[in-house]
Protein backbone atom coordinates (compact mmCIF):
# COMPACT_ATOMS: atom_id res chain seq x y z
CA UNK A 1 0.00 0.00 0.00
CA UNK A 2 1.33 3.43 -0.94
CA UNK A 3 1.98 5.65 2.07
CA UNK A 4 4.30 8.22 0.48
CA UNK A 5 4.80 9.70 -2.98
CA UNK A 6 8.21 11.25 -3.71
CA UNK A 7 8.32 13.42 -6.80
CA UNK A 8 10.96 15.47 -8.53
CA UNK A 9 9.84 18.91 -9.73
CA UNK A 10 11.49 20.16 -12.94
CA UNK A 11 10.73 17.92 -15.90
CA UNK A 12 8.54 15.75 -13.69
CA UNK A 13 5.76 17.35 -11.63
CA UNK A 14 6.13 20.79 -13.23
CA UNK A 15 5.27 21.54 -16.83
CA UNK A 16 7.95 23.04 -19.04
CA UNK A 17 6.71 26.54 -18.18
CA UNK A 18 7.41 25.70 -14.49
CA UNK A 19 3.75 25.61 -13.48
CA UNK A 20 1.48 22.88 -12.10
CA UNK A 21 -1.52 21.84 -14.18
CA UNK A 22 -4.98 21.86 -12.63
CA UNK A 23 -5.06 18.07 -13.00
CA UNK A 24 -1.79 17.72 -11.08
CA UNK A 25 -3.00 20.02 -8.28
CA UNK A 26 -6.20 17.97 -8.02
CA UNK A 27 -4.21 14.72 -7.85
CA UNK A 28 -1.95 16.08 -5.10
CA UNK A 29 -4.99 17.17 -3.10
CA UNK A 30 -6.68 13.80 -3.57
CA UNK A 31 -3.54 11.99 -2.41
CA UNK A 32 -3.45 14.02 0.80
CA UNK A 33 -7.16 13.40 1.41
CA UNK A 34 -6.47 9.67 1.01
CA UNK A 35 -3.78 9.84 3.69
CA UNK A 36 -0.80 9.58 1.33
CA UNK A 37 2.09 11.90 2.11
CA UNK A 38 3.63 13.69 -0.88
CA UNK A 39 7.24 14.85 -0.70
CA UNK A 40 8.74 17.24 -3.23
CA UNK A 41 12.33 16.01 -3.78
CA UNK A 42 14.36 18.37 -5.95
CA UNK A 43 17.78 19.63 -6.92
CA UNK A 44 16.47 23.17 -6.44
CA UNK A 45 17.66 25.17 -3.44
CA UNK A 46 15.06 25.94 -0.80
CA UNK A 47 14.87 29.56 -2.01
CA UNK A 48 13.42 28.37 -5.34
CA UNK A 49 10.44 26.53 -3.86
CA UNK A 50 7.79 29.24 -4.21
CA UNK A 51 6.35 27.42 -7.24
CA UNK A 52 5.06 24.61 -4.99
CA UNK A 53 4.81 26.36 -1.63
CA UNK A 54 1.02 26.61 -1.89
CA UNK A 55 0.72 22.92 -2.73
CA UNK A 56 2.82 21.37 0.02
CA UNK A 57 0.86 19.14 2.38
CA UNK A 58 0.28 19.89 6.03
CA UNK A 59 3.62 18.25 6.94
CA UNK A 60 5.34 21.07 5.02
CA UNK A 61 8.45 19.00 4.36
CA UNK A 62 10.48 19.16 1.14
CA UNK A 63 13.89 17.77 0.23
CA UNK A 64 16.02 20.29 -1.65
CA UNK A 65 19.51 20.61 -3.18
CA UNK A 66 19.64 16.90 -4.09
CA UNK A 67 19.22 15.83 -0.49
CA UNK A 68 21.53 18.37 1.14
CA UNK A 69 18.58 20.12 2.81
CA UNK A 70 15.30 19.14 4.40
CA UNK A 71 13.14 22.25 4.66
CA UNK A 72 9.75 23.19 6.07
CA UNK A 73 7.92 25.20 3.43
CA UNK A 74 5.31 26.34 5.95
CA UNK A 75 7.96 28.31 7.84
CA UNK A 76 9.28 30.13 4.77
CA UNK A 77 12.13 27.75 4.15
CA UNK A 78 13.16 26.91 7.69
CA UNK A 79 15.91 24.26 7.51
CA UNK A 80 15.13 21.04 9.37
CA UNK A 81 18.34 19.26 8.37
CA UNK A 82 21.52 20.15 6.48
CA UNK A 83 23.98 17.66 4.97
CA UNK A 84 26.83 19.93 3.97
CA UNK A 85 29.63 19.43 1.47
CA UNK A 86 32.93 19.73 3.34
CA UNK A 87 35.11 22.52 2.01
CA UNK A 88 38.19 20.35 1.56
CA UNK A 89 36.17 17.92 -0.57
CA UNK A 90 34.76 20.82 -2.62
CA UNK A 91 38.25 22.23 -3.19
CA UNK A 92 39.50 18.79 -4.21
CA UNK A 93 36.76 18.58 -6.85
CA UNK A 94 37.55 22.11 -8.07
CA UNK A 95 41.24 21.35 -8.51
CA UNK A 96 40.59 17.93 -10.04
CA UNK A 97 38.09 19.20 -12.62
CA UNK A 98 40.23 22.21 -13.51
CA UNK A 99 42.97 19.75 -14.45
CA UNK A 100 40.76 17.08 -16.05
CA UNK A 101 38.46 19.48 -17.91
CA UNK A 102 40.13 22.86 -18.50
CA UNK A 103 37.56 25.60 -18.91
CA UNK A 104 35.31 24.36 -16.11
CA UNK A 105 33.73 27.18 -14.11
CA UNK A 106 32.17 26.88 -10.67
CA UNK A 107 29.43 28.20 -8.43
CA UNK A 108 28.91 27.54 -4.73
CA UNK A 109 25.39 27.09 -3.35
CA UNK A 110 25.26 27.78 0.39
CA UNK A 111 22.45 27.99 2.91
CA UNK A 112 22.68 31.77 2.45
CA UNK A 113 22.50 31.79 -1.37
CA UNK A 114 24.69 31.29 -4.42
CA UNK A 115 28.10 32.74 -5.30
CA UNK A 116 29.97 32.08 -8.53
CA UNK A 117 33.12 32.54 -10.56
CA UNK A 118 33.34 35.28 -13.23
CA UNK A 119 33.23 32.70 -16.04
CA UNK A 120 30.20 30.86 -14.65
CA UNK A 121 27.14 31.46 -16.88
CA UNK A 122 24.41 33.43 -15.08
CA UNK A 123 21.59 30.88 -15.40
CA UNK A 124 19.62 32.89 -12.85
CA UNK A 125 20.78 36.38 -12.03
CA UNK A 126 21.26 36.82 -8.31
CA UNK A 127 22.04 40.42 -7.37
CA UNK A 128 23.25 39.33 -3.93
CA UNK A 129 25.88 36.94 -5.26
CA UNK A 130 29.60 37.33 -4.66
CA UNK A 131 31.74 36.83 -7.76
CA UNK A 132 35.26 35.46 -7.27
CA UNK A 133 37.36 32.37 -7.97
CA UNK A 134 36.09 29.19 -6.33
CA UNK A 135 38.98 29.00 -3.87
CA UNK A 136 38.01 32.38 -2.49
CA UNK A 137 34.29 31.54 -2.46
CA UNK A 138 35.07 28.43 -0.42
CA UNK A 139 37.43 30.20 1.99
CA UNK A 140 35.64 30.65 5.30
CA UNK A 141 37.33 34.00 5.89
CA UNK A 142 35.64 35.48 2.81
CA UNK A 143 32.68 37.62 3.97
CA UNK A 144 29.51 35.54 3.82
CA UNK A 145 31.38 32.36 2.89
CA UNK A 146 31.27 30.71 6.31
CA UNK A 147 27.80 29.24 5.80
CA UNK A 148 27.37 25.50 5.10
CA UNK A 149 28.02 24.51 1.48
CA UNK A 150 25.08 22.61 -0.01
CA UNK A 151 26.28 22.10 -3.57
CA UNK A 152 29.22 22.89 -5.77
CA UNK A 153 28.12 23.52 -9.35
CA UNK A 154 30.51 22.88 -12.23
CA UNK A 155 29.83 24.04 -15.80
CA UNK A 156 31.63 23.31 -19.05
CA UNK A 157 30.85 25.03 -22.34
CA UNK A 158 32.09 22.33 -24.72
CA UNK A 159 31.80 18.86 -23.18
CA UNK A 160 28.67 16.77 -23.68
CA UNK A 161 26.69 16.59 -20.41
CA UNK A 162 26.98 12.82 -19.87
CA UNK A 163 30.66 12.79 -20.87
CA UNK A 164 31.36 15.57 -18.35
CA UNK A 165 29.50 13.62 -15.66
CA UNK A 166 31.43 10.42 -16.40
CA UNK A 167 34.74 12.30 -16.34
CA UNK A 168 33.94 13.99 -13.03
CA UNK A 169 32.82 10.76 -11.37
CA UNK A 170 35.93 8.93 -12.59
CA UNK A 171 38.35 11.61 -11.37
CA UNK A 172 36.63 13.00 -8.26
CA UNK A 173 33.81 10.62 -7.36
CA UNK A 174 35.78 9.22 -4.43
CA UNK A 175 35.43 12.53 -2.55
CA UNK A 176 31.91 13.68 -3.39
CA UNK A 177 28.57 12.66 -4.91
CA UNK A 178 28.33 14.03 -8.45
CA UNK A 179 25.20 14.12 -10.59
CA UNK A 180 23.30 16.31 -13.04
CA UNK A 181 19.76 17.45 -13.79
CA UNK A 182 20.31 20.18 -16.37
CA UNK A 183 20.16 19.67 -20.15
CA UNK A 184 23.50 21.50 -20.34
CA UNK A 185 26.91 20.34 -19.08
CA UNK A 186 26.18 21.49 -15.53
CA UNK A 187 27.18 19.13 -12.73
CA UNK A 188 25.89 19.18 -9.16
CA UNK A 189 28.37 18.12 -6.47
CA UNK A 190 27.21 17.12 -2.97
CA UNK A 191 28.79 15.57 0.08
CA UNK A 192 29.81 11.94 -0.31
CA UNK A 193 26.73 9.78 0.17
CA UNK A 194 24.32 12.71 -0.07
CA UNK A 195 21.53 12.17 -2.59
CA UNK A 196 17.79 12.49 -2.96
CA UNK A 197 17.59 8.78 -2.12
CA UNK A 198 19.58 8.77 1.12
CA UNK A 199 17.78 11.81 2.54
CA UNK A 200 14.38 10.47 1.48
CA UNK A 201 15.25 7.13 3.10
CA UNK A 202 16.07 8.92 6.37
CA UNK A 203 12.80 10.90 6.27
CA UNK A 204 10.84 7.72 5.60
CA UNK A 205 12.61 5.84 8.40
CA UNK A 206 11.61 8.61 10.83
CA UNK A 207 7.99 8.02 9.80
CA UNK A 208 8.17 4.23 9.88
CA UNK A 209 7.62 4.07 6.12
CA UNK A 210 9.31 1.22 4.23
CA UNK A 211 10.70 1.52 0.67
CA UNK A 212 7.91 -0.82 -0.51
CA UNK A 213 5.38 1.81 0.60
CA UNK A 214 6.94 4.59 -1.51
CA UNK A 215 6.19 5.57 -5.12
CA UNK A 216 8.79 7.84 -6.76
CA UNK A 217 8.86 9.90 -9.97
CA UNK A 218 11.79 11.45 -11.85
CA UNK A 219 13.34 12.32 -15.19
CA UNK A 220 17.08 13.02 -14.83
CA UNK A 221 20.24 11.31 -13.51
CA UNK A 222 19.91 12.92 -10.06
CA UNK A 223 16.69 10.90 -9.63
CA UNK A 224 18.18 7.47 -10.38
CA UNK A 225 19.09 6.41 -6.83
CA UNK A 226 15.66 7.50 -5.55
CA UNK A 227 13.86 5.56 -8.28
CA UNK A 228 15.97 2.48 -7.55
CA UNK A 229 15.31 2.74 -3.79
CA UNK A 230 11.53 3.17 -3.92
CA UNK A 231 9.31 0.10 -4.07
CA UNK A 232 7.51 1.54 -7.09
CA UNK A 233 9.01 4.13 -9.40
CA UNK A 234 8.19 5.79 -12.68
CA UNK A 235 10.37 7.46 -15.28
CA UNK A 236 8.63 10.28 -17.08
CA UNK A 237 7.94 10.02 -20.80
CA UNK A 238 10.58 12.71 -21.29
CA UNK A 239 13.16 11.01 -19.04
CA UNK A 240 16.88 10.47 -19.66
CA UNK A 241 17.58 6.90 -20.94
CA UNK A 242 19.50 5.99 -17.77
CA UNK A 243 16.47 7.02 -15.70
CA UNK A 244 14.17 4.85 -17.81
CA UNK A 245 16.52 1.91 -17.21
CA UNK A 246 16.56 2.49 -13.43
CA UNK A 247 12.83 2.99 -12.90
CA UNK A 248 10.43 0.11 -12.44
CA UNK A 249 7.74 1.71 -14.61
CA UNK A 250 7.08 4.45 -17.14
CA UNK A 251 4.45 7.15 -17.24
CA UNK A 252 3.56 10.00 -19.59
CA UNK A 253 5.71 13.10 -19.98
CA UNK A 254 5.59 16.06 -17.61
CA UNK A 255 3.63 18.01 -20.24
CA UNK A 256 1.02 15.23 -20.22
CA UNK A 257 0.40 15.03 -16.44
CA UNK A 258 2.44 11.86 -16.03
CA UNK A 259 2.57 12.06 -12.23
CA UNK A 260 -1.16 12.79 -11.91
CA UNK A 261 -1.98 9.80 -14.13
CA UNK A 262 -0.29 7.37 -11.74
CA UNK A 263 -1.73 9.00 -8.61
CA UNK A 264 -5.23 8.77 -10.11
CA UNK A 265 -4.65 5.08 -10.88
CA UNK A 266 -3.44 4.34 -7.34
CA UNK A 267 -6.42 6.11 -5.78
CA UNK A 268 -8.93 4.49 -8.14
CA UNK A 269 -7.60 1.03 -7.29
CA UNK A 270 -7.72 1.84 -3.59
CA UNK A 271 -11.31 3.08 -3.84
CA UNK A 272 -12.34 -0.16 -5.54
CA UNK A 273 -10.51 -2.28 -3.01
CA UNK A 274 -8.21 -3.70 -5.67
CA UNK A 275 -4.45 -4.11 -5.49
CA UNK A 276 -2.97 -0.73 -6.34
CA UNK A 277 -2.21 -0.27 -10.02
CA UNK A 278 1.49 0.38 -9.82
Where are the regions that the model predicts?
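Conserved acidic, metal-coordinating active-site core of Asp-based
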Residues: 100-217, 221-222, 226
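Hydrophobic packing residues within well-ordered alpha-helices of enzyme cores
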Residues: 24, 49-53, 164, 168, ...
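Short, structured coil segments at secondary-structure junctions
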Residues: 56-58, 65-66, 172-174, 229-230, ...
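Active-site phosphate-binding/coordination module
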Residues: 22-123
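Asp-based phosphoryl-transfer active-site loop
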Residues: 3-16
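Active-site glycine-centered loops adjacent to acidic/histidine catalytic or metal-binding residues
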Residues: 8, 42, 219
Amino acid sequence: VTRLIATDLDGTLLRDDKTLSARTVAALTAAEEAGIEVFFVTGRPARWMDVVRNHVQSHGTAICANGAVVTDLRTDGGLLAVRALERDAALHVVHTLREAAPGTSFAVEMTTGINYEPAYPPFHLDPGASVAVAEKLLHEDTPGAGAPVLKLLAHHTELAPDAFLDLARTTAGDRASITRSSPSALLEVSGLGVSKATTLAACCAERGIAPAEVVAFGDMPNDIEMLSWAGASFAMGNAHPDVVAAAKGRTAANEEDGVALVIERILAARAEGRAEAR
